[in-house]
């Protein structure tokens, strides 16, 4: 079957830059799906996108749909005709379903049959519908109309190219009649661009100062920005999202170096970077020490004969924004950071939980407790907690919300606060996302954990639990943040104590009955997904969850030990034995003896197990107390022999009540020894 290349390009007014790549990929995916559904084979489909165009090039597309055979079975002959040979409703209904007269139905077999070959349609007839369906299915949140047209799209359309081989496909889509005339660069080549065939698309447009390949433009910008930064003895900050957005804004990228006055470097560099990236789409430059250079890179969409004019224009545009940041910084420094807390007394954190200042005071006290328990400085943690929200009332954060915490850090340093206190004002928000950076100081860790626990307890305490995809207070992220800090920073905090302390601070503002258990369960539930991501078997997590350690660090140490224990040859048998013991003890209704009495033993294996347990207790209990859980489980693995022998030789449910109770006490002692680490019956 013959095949030709196919090209579709929809020209528009400037498309939303943040959505361009997504729209192009969806357009291509929709066409691929349409071709496959139609049975039209092809070699490859490639999406192209620039600010004023979406395009898809399909290589070696079949020119004809294959023929299809339809074979339908109808009702049995005895149901199709009555005793007089007249067709029944079943026969007539089958004929209607097939779209033919009953005379055309095959009656030669035991059932009515209908067979027909449907000739495949030419691709040229199918492609307009496939393209239109793909465009209709694009992920466009809000479509628009233009002029007096009824058609809707993300932006008004300007032209349409549809070529199959060298032939134009005659059709109209979104108010545009298909042709072979594209458009070049808006300034360098504003006229029509003749596309002779699909395979020449990229080069035809390149000659008109348009790089239609999004990936090519992206790479060109990234390399040139890196090169220019190096020439300035610096390195560029190139966030992937910003690079994508800039790529979507230009058809013919020309990166240029610009500069600003060095006096602006007195302003926190994060504020300068934020305004240059977010508002102006510039790439900022850092020196070898990570400090901001008074230069930036803009990406022009034109190859100017006088680049200095473009540079000058961008420098004039950015100056007022940097001046604003400088003004806010100087204004804020006119009063102590702590004084901004007065403004927070009028800012509501949550209607039922008081003001942001109330929260800062709670965080301060809780951070002090956490620091005290984890080897930090209580006074500094309390000071950092008290100042933790002050910068929310500053002019800087009011203008640049992303500066919360960062502004506080600079203002605290400026006032002579200890460095760990200043750092904590920023580190309280860490980690800012999955895999995000953790606090570098004990003070920062204490405030970060305190802030998150206060939010968890408060929001849970008023019954606003996260449901499904709705989590307005980011409680899942807060719980994960607490766990990451405590585990990865090796901080041994009793979360039961910390959560109860947090509850006590709210007084009657929260419903305290059962609240601690609810919050702790929510926090430790988050560990399951964490371990699954790390490749830890869920059974190891469940075995530790069953013994309910109060410390996240302790929990993790136990899980790692159980995971290692599972690799031992004795693990499977001991897990099964523990499960058997657990089931037996659950069914024992009498009161267990306080101690095991050897005088009730009547089998040598009972003595052997008892002796082995005594030796194991002496070795394991100190190990468990020292949290050397892996070594403890390795030592407990030696019990496999005595345990197997016991169950093989002894009937636990002896007729004599005293013997029976004593055997249950022996098994309870065995189970208790393992429960000092984890419930390994969960591994069985």
UniProtKB/Swiss-Prot annotation:
InterPro entries attached to this UniProt entry: DALR_anticod-bd, Gly-tRNA-synth_bsu, Gly-tRNA-synth_heterodimer
Reaction(s) this enzyme catalyzes, per UniProt: tRNA(Gly) + glycine + ATP = glycyl-tRNA(Gly) + AMP + diphosphate
Keyword Cytoplasm in annotation: yes
Keyword Acyltransferase: no
Keywords attached to this entry: Aminoacyl-tRNA synthetase, ATP-binding, Cytoplasm, Ligase, Nucleotide-binding, Protein biosynthesis
A GO biological-process term: glycyl-tRNA aminoacylation
Enzyme Commission numbers on file: 6.1.1.14
GO molecular function, one term: glycine-tRNA ligase activity
Intracellular or extracellular location(s): Cytoplasm
HAMAP family linked: Gly_tRNA_synth_beta
NCBIfam families: glyS
Name of the protein: Glycine--tRNA ligase beta subunit
Organism: Stutzerimonas stutzeri (strain A1501) (Pseudomonas stutzeri)
Gene: glyS
